[in-house]
Amino acid sequence: MKTKWFGGLRYACYVATLFFVLIHAGCNKKEVIPATPELPVLEQFMIEKQNNPGLEADIAFAIKGDSVIATEPYRYRKMLVPSFVTNAQGIFVGVVKQESGATAVDFSTVQTYTVISKDGLRKTYFVKIDWIADSLPHLYIQTEGNTPITSKDDYVNATLRIDGMGKYADFTGTTRIKGRGNSTWGYPKKPYRLKLNTAASLLGLAAEKDWVLLANYLDPTLMLNAVAMKIGTQLELPYTNHVVPVNITLNDQYIGCYNFTEQIEVDDNRVKVGGDGFLFELDSYYDEPYKFRSAGYSLPVMIKAPELSAAEELLPIQTAFNNMEALLADPAFPVNNYREKIDVESVAKFMLVYFLTDNEELNHPKSTYMHKTATGKYTMGPIWDFDWAFGFEKDQKHFLTYNSAPFWTGKTPLPAGTKFFTRFLKDPQFVALLKQLWTDYKTGHFDALIRFVETYGLSIRTAKAADYAIWKKGAANNQTEVETLQQWLTSRRGYIDDYLNSL
């Protein structure tokens, strides 16, 4: 019995000891928490000059959410090698694994990058470059025998070659070229007119023979005419010109950055009023063969189309114009049928372009166009010539003032254009229309205009510097002038608010 009891005691002690050890071990054991897999992210993305021969500078990207975006001047070669920093084990475009600083990718379109962690977690990024056309189309003009262009009347034979720089179709053909413009022809940087031997579509514009090269010598930004045309397009003014910035080499000499645009003329692809329609220019230069002074306001009316051959052909055109004008001068105005003769919405939109740009040429008037079909209303447009606008003063500086009144109502006697255009402001319905169109423009288009100025400025920055090297107008780096123009437009917007509220 003793032996059995002693064995039982020994067994009990063994069990107790084991229990104590297990309890002690359990109390000291730490809880094991499974590790959370690390999400793969793209930390940095860039295109480095050192890995891309021909690149002028590194291209930096902004990473926001799943978007990776950069803004960069347009380049013909868009197959570029990016560099990146990521915590992922692998990064892929499609099924192709990417190596930082080594794998070339076509950035002419959005590329989808997938980063994958060692645990198989994935994240997708959409990488794109917003390309801005900094490499402008280049026009190479070679006159016959290198003949200089010295006349606004006599054309010189020439060849024209256009390098579209990958953005536009290239072109080679024959043309004639002469000078153009009124006061602008007297400046060192000359404007020109081209007449192709055969109609052609140039720089994406509808096929025609006649084209214009605007020099913009007075313009420190080289974009004021383009900005005005943008406003006209936003307001849907009929037949507003397109503007394409270009570089020009004439007879093997680079002559600067120009605006390439359409010649204002009657044609199906220009001012489409038909063969029996009319195009008028109101201009105090008064230098066309067929012209007249209107009876009511002494407007200098010149006939641009149709092409007349005898003085008697002018009489019915003059009579019809005077009849329209008489309705404006009528003491019963505006309670008469004047709206049946003139498109008042076109007048209102036309005024707003000139108000916002502070183009006071309406007062003379100068370079002021009207058109009509044979049976239609007199309609304002196309808009033209904004060299002397945007706060321009006679010392040839822009942006000095933003609060100049649109009309010269304080002059004695009143200029012809002032009398004609301010007459519309005596019509309450017209003023209400003008105010509504302005409100609509401010809310729907003004911000886009400011962005257009920024984008256009970027697109010409290299050409602007090259132009400055020749003509020393404005500044070599036009970013300051771009910002000045944006600020001026914003201030001018506030002034137009006050002006219209005073009507």
Task: Kindly give the residue locations of the regions a language model identified.
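Internal "kinase-insert"/substrate-recognition segments embedded within catalytic cores
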Residues: 193-195, 199-201, 215-217, 237-241, ...
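A conserved alpha-helical element in kinase catalytic cores
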Residues: 217-238
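Conserved oxyanion/phosphate-binding beta-strand-loop segments in alpha/beta enzyme cores
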Residues: 156-215
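Bacterial Sec-dependent N-terminal signal peptides
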Residues: 1-36
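Short, well-structured beta-strand/strand-turn elements
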Residues: 90-93, 235-247
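Middle-to-C-terminal accessory/interaction subdomains
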Residues: 173, 183, 187-188, 305-364, ...
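Beta-rich interaction/scaffold domains
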Residues: 27-137, 141
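Regulatory N- and C-terminal appendages and interdomain linkers associated
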Residues: 28-36, 43-44, 48, 116-118, ...
